[in-house]
């Protein structure tokens, strides 16, 4: 049995802690034979291989008496880069418990568990459902809406340095002014409506007018300014910080994809430039 979970890009503009999209990088968990103790085989750096691995901790949180197994973990989702690496593991852990424990969890139940563990639904929701998911959590009441993201390209600049979510959150203010809150709310409304209509020009306008988080976090990602400038000059819809950063995401049409990649490559920035596609499916299980 193999469990596959996509990467995600969240905090899309003013969709702070609320809106995320599934993208074409993946965590894969191969479930092998039962064992006397949990073993997670992988080649990742500084990640436990025993029961303390987040994958196993999550699975045991869902069902504490699961029989230990030998597992193989593969992932091309970079760690601490704002592409949902921890969320993918949490979602995989929930699915691992669901499969080994024969729990028959609904998608809604998976989302509730994942949100409780992660603290917010913006990454875990698209990892579960796929595509674009708009979510809200108010006093533990979770609502989510799955919609189709308009056809487009996501060009990711993935820096060679990490930016921990905790560090990125520490630069955020404790409060927003009433004026900024109203402005951000209205911009978020326009962004959602334009995405639903397939109007990426207006959506891009709204994405770049977030007041919730990006203006505080941009100084932590020195490459952001020049990437936005070059991408805008070459016809991108929007440039935004993916998740808590440091990945910088450029949203553009398929036609503009290669010209933008070519121009960004000329900058010789300290990181990788990768074109990602929208993943329409969330977590899935392949039986052998």
Swiss-Prot record:
Belongs to the GHMP kinase family. Homoserine kinase subfamily. It catalyses: L-homoserine + ATP = O-phospho-L-homoserine + ADP + H(+). The lineage of its organism: Bacteria, Bacillati, Bacillota, Bacilli, Lactobacillales. GO terms for molecular function: ATP binding; homoserine kinase activity. Its main location: cytoplasm. The keyword DNA repair does not apply. Pfam families: GHMP_kinases_C, GHMP_kinases_N. NCBIfam families: thrB. One of its GO terms (biological process) is threonine biosynthetic process. Catalyzes the ATP-dependent phosphorylation of L-homoserine to L-homoserine phosphate. PROSITE patterns: GHMP_KINASES_ATP. InterPro entries: GHMP_kinase_C_dom, GHMP_kinase_C_sf, GHMP_kinase_N_dom, GHMP_knse_ATP-bd_CS, Homoserine_kinase, Ribosomal_Su5_D2-typ_SF, Ribsml_uS5_D2-typ_fold_subgr. PANTHER family: HOMOSERINE KINASE, HOMOSERINE/4-DIPHOSPHOCYTIDYL-2-C-METHYL-D-ERYTHRITOL KINASE. The keyword Magnesium does not apply. Its EC number is 2.7.1.39. It is found in: Cytoplasm. One of its GO terms (cellular component) is cytoplasm. ATP binds at residues 78-88. Keywords: Amino-acid biosynthesis, ATP-binding, Cytoplasm, Kinase, Nucleotide-binding, Threonine biosynthesis, Transferase. It is an enzyme of class 2 (transferase). Transmembrane segments: none annotated. Pathway: Amino-acid biosynthesis; L-threonine biosynthesis; L-threonine from L-aspartate: step 4/5. This is Homoserine kinase. It comes from Streptococcus agalactiae serotype Ia (strain ATCC 27591 / A909 / CDC SS700).
């Amino acid at each position: 049995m193999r469990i596959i979970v996509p990467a995600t890009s969240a905090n899309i503009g003013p969709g702070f802690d609320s809106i995320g999209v599934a993208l074409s990088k993946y965590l894969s968990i191969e479930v092998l034979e039962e064992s006397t103790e949990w073993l997670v085989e992988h080649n990742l750096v500084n990640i436990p291989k025993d029961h303390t691995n987040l994958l196993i901790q999550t699975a045991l949180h869902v069902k504490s008496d699961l029989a230990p197994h030998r597992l193989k973990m593969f992932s091309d989702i970079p760690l601490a880069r704002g592409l949902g690496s921890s969320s993918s593991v949490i979602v995989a852990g929930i699915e691992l418990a669901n499969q080994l424990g024969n729990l028959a969890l609904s998608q809604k139940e998976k989302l509730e568990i994942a949100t409780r563990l992660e603290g917010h639904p913006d990454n875990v929701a698209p990892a579960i459902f796929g595509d674009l998911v708009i979510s809200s959590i108010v006093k533990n009441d979770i609502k989510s809406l799955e919609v189709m993201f308009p056809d487009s390209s996501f060009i990711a600049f993935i820096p060679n340095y990490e930016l921990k979510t905790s560090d990125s959150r520490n630069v955020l203010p404790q409060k927003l002014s009433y004026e900024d809150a109203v402005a951000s709310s209205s911009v978020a409304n326009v962004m959602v409506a334009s995405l639903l209509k397939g109007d990426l020009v207006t959506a891009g306008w709204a994405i770049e007018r977030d007041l919730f988080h990006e203006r505080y976090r941009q100084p932590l990602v020195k490459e952001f300014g020049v990437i936005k400038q070059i991408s805008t000059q070459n016809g991108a819809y929007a440039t935004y910080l993916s998740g808590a950063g440091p990945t910088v995401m450029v949203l553009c049409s398929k036609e503009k994809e290669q010209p933008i990649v070519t121009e960004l490559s000329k900058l010789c920035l300290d990181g990788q430039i990768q074109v990602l596609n929208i993943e329409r499916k969330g977590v899935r299980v392949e039986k052998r």
